[in-house]
């Protein structure tokens, strides 16, 4: 019988399957080096924020389809002093609950992310060729419509690895991934949120 493994990225937002016979076990040294590189990246950002003594007031609501990344995001936001609420919500349920969360938390910045990916190469303009882009698009639409009705200038980042960038922007996202349909770093959405929170109109 064919045995399939489900692979999840540690620092890259990817979830994929592969045959066991195609996999190579990573040695402990390589895993340790990768972990240290990632931790050093976070430490550099944290040091820069402390050095600059930036005060942030933009409130962030972060929806993440992956529980592990949601928990890591909480740690990251706390380390650099961002005012963030992180919720682990499956991609296909985010649109159903977004209005309720916007009412409850009244954020200035909304991050909508999780896992995504193209099913077949080449079909860039077919939203059904993406694992979760249609769910992200619907969540963006719901959030943008709600913000317009309530006169809120909500800044939205949406998407994950290989998401349908153009559809997300058309739906109302200010920032989205990924225009080149590439894999994105776990930190990418968080860094965008951080930069927006530091802008003058958020202070």
Model-derived segments and their meaning:
Residues 2-21:
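Basic/aromatic-rich interaction segments and small domains that mediate binding to polyanionic partners
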Residues 102-115, 173:
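Proline-aspartate-enriched helix->loop->beta-strand connector
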């Amino acid at each position: 019988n064919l045995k399939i493994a489900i692979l999840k990225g540690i620092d890259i937002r990817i979830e994929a399957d592969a045959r066991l016979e195609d996999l190579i076990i990573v040695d402990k040294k390589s895993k340790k080096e990768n972990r240290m590189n990632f931790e050093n990246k976070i430490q550099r950002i944290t040091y820069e924020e402390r050095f600059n003594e930036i005060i942030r007031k933009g409130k962030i609501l972060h929806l993440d389809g992956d529980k592990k990344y949601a928990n890591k995001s909480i740690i990251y936001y706390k380390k650099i002093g961002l005012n963030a609420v992180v919720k682990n919500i499956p991609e296909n349920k985010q649109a159903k609950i977004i209005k309720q969360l916007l009412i409850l938390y009244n954020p200035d910045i909304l991050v909508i992310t999780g896992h995504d990916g193209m099913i077949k190469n080449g079909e860039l303009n077919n939203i059904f060729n993406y694992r979760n882009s249609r769910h992200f698009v619907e969540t963006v639409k719901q959030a943008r419509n709600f913000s317009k009705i309530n006169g809120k200038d909500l800044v939205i980042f949406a998407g994950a690895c290989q998401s349908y960038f153009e559809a997300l922007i058309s739906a109302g996202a200010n920032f989205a991934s990924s225009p080149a349909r590439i894999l994105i770093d776990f930190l990418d959405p968080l860094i965008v949120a951080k930069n927006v929170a530091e802008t003058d109109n958020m202070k």
